[in-house]
């Protein structure tokens, strides 16, 4: 379902995106090409001056919440996966090719390209450079913690690419099903 926010801003969604009927998208939200937004995802740019931009070929899986504080922006780079039940809260920038795992929380930070934030991790008030791995359950809230992060491995990169491929397949499949109805 799509709603305008109190400032009367409407979501702008690419015609090639697939949005579940149970997803809720509110306000100044831009969704790019071939994006998959799964069941019960909530994407809210309803606080004054907040905006959310989701790049091309992204997936926003079941029960994900994306929200921005007043006068903040959430930017999700192309080819990024937001896995089941994670929270991305603005102000926040996620670079291209990132993966945010199940139940992870990302708030008030800048995440570079090709990062893997694993399940139930918390990342807050830090800048993470390109190509790092935040381990399962890690709490990264000080810049000094970032120096301890491992580099992305080829296996990690392959995993991220496989998630994107599966979700692009879902966009195509669900789009084709909706044309049959």
Spans of model-derived segments:
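A cytosolic small-molecule/anion-sensing beta-strand core signal
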Residues: 56
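Conserved SET/PR domain catalytic loop and adjacent active-site segment
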Residues: 39-40, 131
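Glycine-rich hexapeptide-repeat left-handed beta-helix
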Residues: 2-12, 46, 51-53, 62-63, ...
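Glycine/small-residue-rich loop that forms an oxyanion/phosphate-binding "nest" at active or ligand-binding sites
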Residues: 77
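Extended, small-residue-rich solenoid/repeat segments and analogous flexible loops
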Residues: 1-36, 42, 48
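Glycine/small-residue-rich phosphate/adenosyl-binding loop
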Residues: 59
């Amino acid at each position: 379902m799509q709603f305008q926010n109190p400032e009367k801003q409407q979501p702008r969604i690419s015609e090639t995106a697939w949005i579940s009927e149970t997803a809720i998208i509110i306000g100044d939200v831009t969704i790019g090409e071939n994006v998959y937004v799964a069941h019960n995802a909530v994407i809210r740019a309803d606080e004054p001056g907040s905006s959310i931009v989701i790049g091309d070929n992204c997936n926003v899986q079941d029960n994900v919440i994306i929200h921005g504080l007043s006068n903040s922006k959430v930017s999700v780079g192309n080819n990024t996966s937001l896995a089941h039940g994670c929270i991305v809260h603005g102000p926040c920038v996620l670079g291209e090719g990132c993966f945010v795992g199940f139940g992870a929380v990302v708030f008030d930070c800048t995440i570079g390209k090709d990062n893997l934030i694993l399940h139930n991790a918390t990342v807050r008030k830090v800048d993470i450079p390109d190509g790092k791995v935040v381990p399962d359950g890690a709490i990264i809230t000080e810049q000094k913690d970032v120096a301890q992060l491992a580099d992305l491995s080829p296996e990690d990169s392959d995993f991220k690419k496989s998630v994107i491929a599966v979700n692009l397949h879902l966009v195509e499949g669900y789009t084709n099903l909706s044309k049959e109805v």
